[in-house]
Amino acid sequence: ALGDQLLSVFVDHTLVDEVA
């Protein structure tokens, strides 16, 4: 679903921020 994809992108960026 579009919402799922958007959430996935949001989570991906959040994880990157956490690692960085």
UniProtKB/Swiss-Prot annotation:
Describe the location of the GMPS ATP-PPase domain by residue ranges. Answer: 1-20
Record field: catalytic activity: XMP + L-glutamine + ATP + H2O = GMP + L-glutamate + AMP + diphosphate + 2 H(+)
Q: What is its EC number?
A: 6.3.5.2
Q: Which superkingdom does the taxonomy of this entry point to? A: Bacteria
| Disulfide-bonded cysteines | none
Q: Which one of the record's GO molecular function terms can you name?
A: GMP synthase (glutamine-hydrolyzing) activity
Pathway noted in the entry: Purine metabolism; GMP biosynthesis; GMP from XMP (L-Gln route): step 1/1
Keywords assigned by UniProt? ATP-binding, Glutamine amidotransferase, GMP biosynthesis, Ligase, Nucleotide-binding, Purine biosynthesis
Induction, per UniProt: Repressed by elevated hydrostatic pressure.
Q: What class of enzyme is it?
A: ligase
Task: Give the quaternary structure.
Answer: Homodimer.
Say what the protein does. Answer: Catalyzes the synthesis of GMP from XMP.
Protein's name according to its UniProt entry = GMP synthase [glutamine-hydrolyzing]
Source species of the chain: Fructilactobacillus sanfranciscensis
Gene that encodes the chain: guaA
